[in-house]
């Protein structure tokens, strides 16, 4: 048994921004009290990981990225009661301690222990479990899943159905839940309503699925890459718009498409400040709601006309789709197993972990929706 011992394994380490991943042998320390060591079997490539590589998100280096994964518990630290070795699990970047105000509030889901910036790259005790040639390597959002083994706090790991296919349900660890929940929980999309989704990547398409599940009658997908349109329509978009096809701003285009009313719900699923304000300006001036789902670049600022809000619009953010992570993830996995929603159309590529750089190239070139790396 490897329990209680240091494990040597392969990991994809990033040494500095704008540089590719290097696959190297690292050492993974045993879990401390209330921590879990996980053998990762599948990990999705999410745009937030790429935001670190591009330098848009500021983190400490060297780092092991990856936060949308599934695996099996290898060993547990002292005091861990909610899972045991051999259990299938999903590590989550959003913990649920169950004790802070946010965890206890019916509408809260951003636990006090969350690391949503500044990013320390360390576990709760202020240290890392990863080392390379004796020097510490940082964890991304306390998950760090582009490695054969990782260690995460128990309150950030969720036990799931033993029969769940890990190479699919790993998407519930971030992308799917984030988009789907933004529509259902954060916006609370109503039946018969009109929605606009800015950005048709994996999270945007999941938002489209959430709008459809909530009963929206019109779902307008917006992207500058028209290759994304057929998949968006397959998943529920009723029409798709490329802003580059118009001389006027996209919010004016959307007002024209809705008889001068604007949409009832808009979702920014890109992470750009200009599209955040465009999404706000696209919704109904009195009862429209716009939700920021895309991760904004570190230290970015927004300037906008407050009259946009004064007339009654609601502008809000959404992290992990508003779900309480430990409560929701097992339910979402069960719903997937019960065919309440599908994940297959979101997964365009599956490739061995060693091809991680190729997977990120597919993302940047707009050729993939989700690439799942298998170990």
From Swiss-Prot:
GO terms for cellular component: cytosol. NAD(+) binds at residues 199-204, 223, 228, 293-295, 370. It is found in: Cytoplasm. It catalyses: a primary alcohol + NAD(+) = an aldehyde + NADH + H(+); a secondary alcohol + NAD(+) = a ketone + NADH + H(+). One of its GO terms (biological process) is retinol metabolic process. Zn(2+) 2 binds at residues 97, 100, 103, 111. The lineage of its organism: Eukaryota, Metazoa, Chordata, Craniata, Vertebrata. Its main location: cytoplasm. Its cofactor is Zn(2+). PROSITE patterns: ADH_ZINC. Binds 2 Zn(2+) ions per subunit. Belongs to the zinc-containing alcohol dehydrogenase family. Class-I subfamily. The keyword Phosphoprotein does not apply. One of its GO terms (molecular function) is all-trans-retinol dehydrogenase (NAD+) activity. Zn(2+) 1 binds at residues 46, 67, 174. This is Alcohol dehydrogenase 1B. It comes from the Eukaryota. The keyword Ribosomal protein does not apply.
């Amino acid at each position: 048994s490897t329990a209680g011992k240091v494990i040597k394994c392969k990991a994809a380490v990033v040494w500095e921004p704008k540089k590719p991943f290097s696959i190297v042998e690292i050492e993974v320390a045993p879990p401390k009290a209330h921590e879990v060591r996980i053998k990762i079997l599948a990990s999705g490539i999410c745009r937030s990981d790429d935001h670190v590589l591009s330098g848009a998100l500021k983190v400490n280096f060297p780092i092991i990225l990856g936060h949308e994964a599934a695996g099996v518990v290898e060993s547990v630290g002292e005091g861990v009661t909610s899972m045991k070795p051999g259990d299938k699990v999903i590590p989550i970047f959003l913990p649920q301690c169950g004790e802070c105000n946010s965890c206890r509030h019916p509408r809260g889901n951003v636990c006090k222990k969350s690391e949503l910036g500044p990013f320390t790259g360390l576990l709760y005790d202020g240290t890392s479990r990863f080392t390379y040639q004796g020097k510490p390597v940082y964890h991304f959002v306390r998950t760090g899943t582009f490695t054969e083994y990782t260690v995460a706090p128990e309150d950030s790991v969720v036990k799931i159905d033993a029969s769940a296919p890990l190479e699919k349900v790993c998407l519930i660890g971030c992308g799917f839940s984030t988009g789907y929940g933004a529509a259902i929980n954060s916006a609370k999309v109503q039946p018969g309503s009109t929605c606009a989704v800015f950005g048709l990547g994996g999270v945007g398409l999941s938002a489209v699925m959430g709008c459809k599940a909530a009963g929206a009658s019109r779902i307008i997908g917006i992207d500058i890459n028209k290759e994304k349109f057929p998949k968006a329509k397959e998943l529920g978009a009723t029409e798709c718009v490329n802003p580059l096809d118009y001389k006027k701003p996209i919010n004016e285009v959307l007002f024209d498409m809705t008889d001068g009313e604007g949409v009832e719900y808009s979702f920014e699923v890109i992470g750009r400040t200009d599209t955040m304000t465009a999404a706000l300006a696209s919704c109904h001036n009195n009862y429209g709601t716009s939700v920021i789902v895309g991760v904004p670049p570190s230290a970015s600022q927004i300037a906008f006309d407050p009259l946009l809000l004064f007339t009654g619009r609601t502008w809000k953010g959404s992290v992990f789709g508003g779900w309480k992570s430990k409560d929701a993830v097992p339910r979402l996995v069960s719903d997937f197993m019960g065919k309440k929603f599908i994940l297959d159309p979101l997964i365009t590529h599956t490739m061995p972990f060693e091809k991680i750089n190729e997977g990120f190239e597919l993302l940047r070139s707009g050729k993939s929706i989700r690439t799942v790396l298998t170990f």
